[in-house]
């Protein structure tokens, strides 16, 4: 039994030992193969590494630096801009070329015949279309226009018995003899020119002699006032007429060399109608003057003076001890007394009122207050620019029945050109015809009295005598 066990053990050992020898041989073979592979791989890796290093070095040498990168990036931008500019220049030149080519083709097309061939006949036909036809069309268009008068018509500066478009037959003769200073005559009437005393304006009078068809034209220079006599009286002796137009006769100066002058010229004015330019009718008179007549009145009237009150007309002042403390504080220094603080309130729209009336009138401030009180307030009103030409105070007033009366005659202005605006009737009691009353103002913020006066004051600057207009207030 023991021998059998021993035999089995040996067999097992032999079986187990045989694979182990084969594994070791395989391991050796594998190790040798791995060694050969590793050496080949190492050699291949070294070759790849050397080639990679060479390529990397060459690429690194050719790679731009950081400083060179922006310059290369800028070049495409400039190239793009230049490309756009060149493109638009090409477009512009192409359009100019197309325009000239098209114009030349259109121009040359007029010199071709219907078969689009250039011949001598087609050339002359195109020349006629370009040169002669426009001239003929303009001539034809000129013939279609209404004919223009060949003789210059006289200028009329007023409307009289016949319309201004009427051509006076004596005007041509009057024009011929205009340069001469002596007497001249024509076949259809008497044309007289006196020696020019004033000179330049001439009046042509047409008067009927015996019938309506026969006229006598007299051309007279304006004479001195002593050579014209006015005899205007209404004829009331005729029966059957309620009124007769008033007539004014102008007698020309006597001259021994003139025998055919009419005795008088009649201007008819209806006393029942308004003496305006449309109502005034001058019979048988035609005005032929080279210049517009001079105005009878001087257009430049002297500048008028406007006197303004201070307290309760332009401003309202409140002392320091009152309830309200708003407004502009102004300290008043009265000699011999302590300074007093006043709060000044402007009347609504005062600045706008003063800025307008200062352009129309010469302004004077006349107040019944004392000078130490009034001067700081007036200076406050004139802080932007000087408004008042003069200032008058309580010492310039007259005390009448315990009231201060302002005598505006001390301003040395004629009473026809001076006005006063005051809220106290006692202040302008001496010159009521020069006064413009106004309501006193204390604290009403909706007051518009100064604005309402502007349109009236604007009209007063063109009045000859302000008393004629302001005195209507006193008429009963």
From Swiss-Prot:
Bias kind Basic and acidic residues: ranges: 64-74
Swiss-Prot/TrEMBL catalytic activity: O-phospho-L-seryl-[protein] + H2O = L-seryl-[protein] + phosphate; O-phospho-L-threonyl-[protein] + H2O = L-threonyl-[protein] + phosphate
Disulfide bonds: none
Protein topology in the membrane: Single-pass membrane protein
Residue spans of biased composition, Polar residues class: 234-256
Keyword Endoplasmic reticulum set for record: yes
Residue ranges crossing the lipid bilayer per the database entry: 123-139
GO cellular component, one term: Nem1-Spo7 phosphatase complex
Cited InterPro entries: Dullard_phosphatase (IPR011948), FCP1_dom (IPR004274), HAD-like_sf (IPR036412), HAD_sf (IPR023214), TIM50 (IPR050365)
Positions of glycan attachment: 237, 257, 284, 356
Keywords: Endoplasmic reticulum, Glycoprotein, Hydrolase, Membrane, Nucleus, Protein phosphatase, Transmembrane, Transmembrane helix
SUPFAM superfamilies according to UniProt: HAD-like
Occurrences of domain FCP1 homology (ranges): 299-460
Subunit composition and interactions: Component of the nem1-spo7 complex.
Protein's UniProt name: Nuclear envelope morphology protein 1
Originating species: Schizosaccharomyces pombe (strain 972 / ATCC 24843) (Fission yeast)
Gene behind the chain: nem1
């Amino acid at each position: 039994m023991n021998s059998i066990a021993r035999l089995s053990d040996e067999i097992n050992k032999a079986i187990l030992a045989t694979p182990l020898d084969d594994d070791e041989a395989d391991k050796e073979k594998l190790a040798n193969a791995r060694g050969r592979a590793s050496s080949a791989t190492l050699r291949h890796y070294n070759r790849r590494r050397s080639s990679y290093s060479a390529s990397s070095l060459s690429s690194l040498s050719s790679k731009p630096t950081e400083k060179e990168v922006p310059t290369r990036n800028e070049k495409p931008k400039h190239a793009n801009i230049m490309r756009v500019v060149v493109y638009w220049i090409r477009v512009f030149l192409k359009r100019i070329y197309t325009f000239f080519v098209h114009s030349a083709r259109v121009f040359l097309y007029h010199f071709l015949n219907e078969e689009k061939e250039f011949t001598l006949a087609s050339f002359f036909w195109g020349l006629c279309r370009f040169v002669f036809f426009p001239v003929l069309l303009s001539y034809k268009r000129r013939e279609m226009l209404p004919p223009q008068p060949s003789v210059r018509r006289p200028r009329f500066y007023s409307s009289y018995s016949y319309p201004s478009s009427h051509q006076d037959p004596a005007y041509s003769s009057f024009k011929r003899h205009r340069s001469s200073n002596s007497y001249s005559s024509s076949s259809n009437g008497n044309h007289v020119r006196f020696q020019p005393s004033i000179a330049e304006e001439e009046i042509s009078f047409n008067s009927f002699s015996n019938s309506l068809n026969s006229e006598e034209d007299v051309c007279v220079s304006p004479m001195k006032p002593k050579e014209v006599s006015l005899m205007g009286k209404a004829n009331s002796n005729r029966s059957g007429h309620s009124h007769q137009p008033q007539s004014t006769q102008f007698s020309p100066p006597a001259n021994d060399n003139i025998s055919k002058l009419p005795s008088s010229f009649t201007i008819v004015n209806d006393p029942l109608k308004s003496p305006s330019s449309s109502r005034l009718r001058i019979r048988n008179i035609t005005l032929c003057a080279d210049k517009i007549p001079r105005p009878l009145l001087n257009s430049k009237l002297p500048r008028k003076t406007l006197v303004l009150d201070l307290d309760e007309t332009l401003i309202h002042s409140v002392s320091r001890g009152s309830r309200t403390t708003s407004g502009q504080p102004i300290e008043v220094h009265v000699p011999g007394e302590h300074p007093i603080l006043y709060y000044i309130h402007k009347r609504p729209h005062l600045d706008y009122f003063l800025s307008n009336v200062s352009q129309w009138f010469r302004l004077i401030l006349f107040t019944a207050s004392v000078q130490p009180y009034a001067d700081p307030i007036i200076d406050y009103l004139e802080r932007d620019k000087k408004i008042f030409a003069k200032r008058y105070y309580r010492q310039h007033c007259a005390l009448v029945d315990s009231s201060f009366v302002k005598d505006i005659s001390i301003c040395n202005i004629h009473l026809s050109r001076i006005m006063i605006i005051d809220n106290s009737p006692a202040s302008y009691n001496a010159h009521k015809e020069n006064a413009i009353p106004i309501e006193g103002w204390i604290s009403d913020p909706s007051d518009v009295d100064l604005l309402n006066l502007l349109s009236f004051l604007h009209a007063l600057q063109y009045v000859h005598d302000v008393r004629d207009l302001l005195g209507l207030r006193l008429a009963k």
